[in-house]
From Swiss-Prot:
Modified residues (Phosphoserine): 7, 45, 48, 74, 77, 98
Leucine-zipper, as annotated region: 194-214
Protein name, as recorded: Max-like protein X
Tissues showing expression: Expressed in all tissues examined: stomach, duodenum, jejunum, ileum, colon, liver, pancreas, salivary gland, kidney, spleen, lung, heart, skeletal muscle, brain, ovary and testis.
Cellular component annotations (GO), alphabetically ordered: cytoplasm; nucleoplasm; nucleus
Protein encoded by which gene: Mlx
Domain bHLH: 129-187
CDD domains: bHLHzip_Mlx
Gene Ontology terms: biological process: nucleocytoplasmic transport; positive regulation of glycolytic process; positive regulation of lipid biosynthetic process; positive regulation of transcription from RNA polymerase II promoter by glucose
Native species: Mus musculus (Mouse)
Entry keyword set: Activator, Cytoplasm, DNA-binding, Nucleus, Phosphoprotein, Repressor, Transcription, Transcription regulation
Keyword NAD in record: no
Pfam families attached to this UniProt entry: HLH
Length: 298
């Protein structure tokens, strides 16, 4: 503390002012270095009157702090209270600016970081969900294929039969498919064969229906005229026709049969039946006998 009547020329006053000026200059330069890379940090230029001490304040009296310093040195008198207050306020302001700039630069932007973290977590969770969904779909596909091969082995009979070349080993997928293809081809052939048989049977049914209709008409005609034709052919004529047919057949039978053994007789009988009892041969024999009887009667 200085006395109210102390002169600015006092060495103690000069030393105190020089120390304050030096401290203020060091603090300003430190703040300038710390705030050089920060946006909005307060900086003091070398021409600032606060860095130049009392001389700077005398040259630039427009600064508020310089007004108090100039008043303290006016009229060759020094007001220690005003000087200490000015120095204290300057140091407090510089310290507050330094703390504010440091805190402003050190406090992180929590909203942006939270949003970035949430986006990264959402991306990771989305990738995990897609990976799990893909894994589940792939597992379902493999299970469906496995069930299909198991069903084929159960349905196809050739897959159930044991192949001795393979042994007791499990059938591979290629073998199951090949056996299935072979079985399907076999089913197609059987289907075609059965369709042909069905077509033949349908034709036979149609022919039988026509014959049935014809026989029904013959029966109906005979029922309408039951006595028609009874007196036209006598029993003697019928016997003569039968006798003529049998004589012709016996002639060929007697010429073809050998009775040396039972085996030869059996062979000759079957050979004679196949040769002389055909429909066309019998037809010719009957026509010839009828012509002979006609000539005899008329």
């Amino acid at each position: 503390m200085t006395e109210p009547g102390a002169s600015p020329e006092d060495p103690w006053v000069k030393a105190s002012f020089a120390d304050a000026h030096a401290g203020e200059g060091r603090a300003g330069r430190a703040r300038a270095r710390r705030g050089s890379g920060r946006r909005g940090a307060p900086q003091l230029s070398p021409e600032s009157p606060l860095l130049s001490g009392a001389r700077g304040c005398r040259e630039d009296s427009s600064h508020p702090a310089c007004a108090k310093v100039e008043y303290a040195y006016s009229d060759n008198s020094l007001d220690p209270g005003l000087f200490v207050e000015s120095t204290h306020k300057g140091s407090v302001v510089s310290r507050a600016n330094s703390i504010g700039s440091t805190s402003a630069s050190s406090v992180p932007n929590t909203d942006d970081e939270d949003s970035d973290y949430q986006q990264e977590a959402y991306k990771e969770s989305y990738k995990d969900r897609r990976r799990r969904a893909h894994t589940q779909a792939e597992q379902k596909r493999r299970d469906a294929i496995k069930r299909g091969y198991d069903d084929l082995q159960t349905i196809v009979p050739t897959c159930q039969q044991q192949d001795f070349s393979i042994g007791s080993q499990k059938l591979s997928k290629a073998i199951v498919l090949q056996k299935t293809i072979d079985y399907i081809q076999f089913l197609h052939k059987e289907k075609k064969k059965q369709e042909e048989e069905v077509s033949t049977l349908r034709k036979d049914v149609t022919a039988l229906k026509i014959m049935k209709v014809n026989y029904e008409q013959i029966v109906k005609a005979h029922q309408d005229n039951p006595h028609e034709g009874e007196d036209q052919v006598s029993d003697q004529v019928k016997f003569n026709v039968f006798q003529g047919i049998m004589d012709s057949l016996f002639q060929s039978f007697n010429a073809s049969i050998s009775v040396a053994s039972f085996q030869e007789l059996s062979a000759c009988v079957f050979s004679w039946i196949e040769e002389h009892c055909e429909p066309q041969t019998l037809r010719e024999i009957v026509i010839g006998v009828l012509h002979q009887l006609k000539n005899q009667l008329y």
